[in-house]
Amino acid sequence: TPGRLADILLVEDLREMKPSQVYFEGRLVAKDCKLIQTCEVGEYPEWLKNTVKLKQLITEKSFRVPARTDRPQTQVTVIDLIDRQIINKRLIATLPCVNGEILADPVHDILKLAIVERYGKTGGVGVGFVRGFGLREGAMAYSMSHDHHNIVVVGVNELDMAQSVKVIQEMQGGLCV
């Protein structure tokens, strides 16, 4: 746009994506893969730094999925990830139920997935199940989902999920593994 400063990456071959020139705020800062000028980034305004305002304390209980049966197992709908695809499949899986709660099944790569509202408006936590992450222990959480920028957390158990969300809150956003 005329009159605006741009960040541009020029490549000669889209298959290699090797930059020949890099422009930062309209200035040439790298040429032929060599930095020729530093890229000073200014301070972020305060309103960008404090955006994780959880309305309620997130604990293990926040990620519990109640079982609607007294049986030791139940069928649930699972998001079945397709490697390197944005479109996924729907899977019906049988998961264990213990003490009135549906549990994840990490042995079969079925984990809990949750979205935690981060702006202090509703305090909502939506929990489901996902297969295909390959996570065998622990949890990961991040706050940079392009659709909504709430906190997304996936984990083998609820305690690790809650701890990951706590770290995201303490960092005021980011990625926690």
Give residue ranges: language-model regions.
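Active-site microenvironment of metallo-dependent hydrolases
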Residues: 1-177
